[in-house]
């Protein structure tokens, strides 16, 4: 799955939502399809 542009994806962490800022969380949800 795509990584966040400003922050690398933590291995084993499939749900970074909540740790990300609301804007990035929304973008990640759309890109990732979560």
Curated annotation (Swiss-Prot):
- Gene Ontology annotations for the cellular component aspect, listed alphabetically: extracellular region
Bridged cysteine pairs (disulfide): none
Q: Highest taxon of the source? A: Eukaryota
Renumbered residue ranges of the record's region Disordered = 1-25
Indicate where this protein is primarily found.
secreted
Q: In which tissues is it expressed?
A: Expressed by the liver and secreted in plasma.
In alphabetical order, the GO MF annotations are: metal ion binding
Keywords assigned by UniProt?
A: Heme, Iron, Metal-binding, Repeat, Secreted, Transport
State the protein's purpose. Answer: Binds heme and transports it to the liver for breakdown and iron recovery, after which the free hemopexin returns to the circulation.
Concerning its family, UniProt says:
Belongs to the hemopexin family.
What is the protein name for this chain?
Hemopexin
Q: Which gene encodes it?
A: HPX
